[in-house]
Amino acid sequence: MIHKFEPFEFFKINKVPIDSVLDIGAHKGKWTQEFKKHYPDVKSLMIEANADHIDDLIRTGHYILALLGKDNEEVDYYMCEDKNNTEGNGVYKENTNVPFKVTRRKCTTLDSLLPGQKFDLIKMDVQGSELDIIQGSPGFIHQAKYLWLELQPHNYNIGAPSAGKVIGYLNQIGFEIVTIDEINVGNGVIMGMDMIFVNIRNKNLKTGYDINKKVIWNGYAS
């Protein structure tokens, strides 16, 4: 069961300026399409590892086919054998009953793929590789105002860093949680959640949000 929240309320209330977004793990481009409904003039770039989705990506906007990670190296890449169920493809194999086959793929870092570029918001939905990508290009990440990440408290992808580990690392480098997009629950357990983080360390960024702003309550619920 997926519990949806209203992340764009945060952006609207705080009048957050977003001029550019990077959609990593774009799949068929649906996230970018939804984001553009709220920020129609935003400049977007999608990165997707699966070439099967090129036709969908072309209809959405600019894209690059690439597999991102912590280093420039070859890695095992797991592909779902069911072509209609490709959202689980990635470096960390799903801990499910779904059959996957493994191939070898060239992996690259954000710094190597997009040298000198920066984006106001970076979204990642990469089956447990979020922390690898962040650690592989810390300077690139430091230039982002916001990170929109899929995280996994449950061991959904074998060997992938847990949500707690990712959140702890982000706190160390100056990113704090501000809101939630969705929580995916199965058998009473949180399988995954999409969380949004603000960069509070890079003072040169105009995030539109003051994490220390006093909260004004109109009243407490009884």
Regions found by a protein language model. Give the residues of each.
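Phosphate/nucleotide-binding beta-alpha loop and adjacent structural elements of enzyme active sites
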Residues: M1-S222
